């Protein structure tokens, strides 16, 4: 049976199979079909998490590749190996083309289907955060006007998500915390604003700490995990100089979190 003929439930099941097989490109295809079938109704929590996980894995592999290649490129430039640098730049360009295609794919889906169909505050924040995330991934490697546009679009999406999150979601809500985590990473990495990054992360952490006793048992694990990541970043950012080049800035976990999971 061709995947185009599958029902919504069957596409969801096939996406789960693809996830188990670690075939994330196909997982994306199955979940895109699901997303495009729901013009007026929202995806379920399970469906939106499957879509997010699929794209996070597909983009994550390329982001990791890009970072490795960029690091090698810097080393070869430092050694004056111009012939190798030319080869590396071409190869990096190939990865950047893939990154752009992936980001464009999910951003188009968010614009055309997911954001317009969302009504619950939780799902609105989830999708606007996702929109900000993928514009941020573009800003990581784009240059000039393209980088500026990507950064501006990231800010608009995160700010819209933040406005709803602060008004509608509890400080301990995993999606609100995940937004604060990624928004602060954007300030630190893309806008080079460590003070603003620390301020945002600290405020989110402190507000969640003050309401920790109100956390439901289902959300406790998810929320405290993201709080730990916020704390890790604050520790990293507030230290004068990080001696360890292997230290990584933490983002919201690959498996996007929601209540009850």
From Swiss-Prot:
Gene Ontology molecular function terms on file: DNA binding; protein-containing complex binding
Cellular component terms (Gene Ontology): cytoplasm; nucleus
Disulphide-bonded residues: none
Top-rank lineage group of the source organism: Eukaryota
SUPFAM superfamilies per the UniProt record, alphabetical: 14-3-3 protein
Matches recorded under Pfam families: 14-3-3
Gene Ontology biological process terms from the UniProt entry: protein localization; regulation of gene expression; signal transduction
Function: Is associated with a DNA binding complex to bind to the G box, a well-characterized cis-acting DNA regulatory element found in plant genes.
The family this protein is said to belong to: Belongs to the 14-3-3 family.
Protein name, as recorded: 14-3-3-like protein GF14-12
Species: Zea mays
């Amino acid at each position: 049976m061709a995947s185009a003929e599958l029902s919504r439930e069957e596409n969801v099941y096939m996406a789960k199979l693809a996830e188990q097989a670690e075939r994330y490109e196909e997982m994306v295809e199955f979940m895109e079909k699901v997303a495009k079938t729901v013009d007026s109704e929202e995806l379920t929590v399970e469906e939106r998490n499957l879509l997010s996980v699929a794209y996070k894995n597909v983009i994550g592999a390329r982001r990791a590749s890009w970072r490795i290649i960029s690091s090698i490129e810097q080393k070869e430039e430092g050694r004056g190996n111009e012939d190798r640098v030319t080869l590396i730049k071409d190869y990096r360009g190939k990865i950047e083309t893939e990154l752009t295609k992936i980001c464009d794919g999910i951003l188009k889906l968010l614009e055309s289907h997911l954001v317009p169909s969302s009504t619950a505050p939780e799902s609105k924040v989830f999708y606007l955060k996702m929109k900000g995330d993928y514009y941020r991934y573009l800003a990581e490697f784009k240059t000039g006007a393209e980088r500026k546009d990507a950064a501006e679009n990231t800010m608009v999406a995160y700010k819209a998500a933040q406005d709803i999150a602060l008004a509608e979601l509890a400080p301990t809500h995993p999606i609100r915390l995940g937004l604060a985590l990624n928004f602060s990473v954007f300030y630190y990495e893309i806008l080079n604003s460590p003070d603003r990054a620390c301020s945002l992360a600290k405020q989110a952490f402190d507000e969640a700490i003050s309401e920790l006793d109100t956390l439901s048992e289902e959300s406790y694990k998810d929320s405290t995990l993201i709080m730990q990541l916020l704390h890790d970043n604050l520790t990293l950012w507030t230290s004068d100089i990080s001696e360890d080049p292997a230290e990584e800035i933490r983002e919201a976990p690959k498996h996007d979190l929601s209540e009850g999971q």
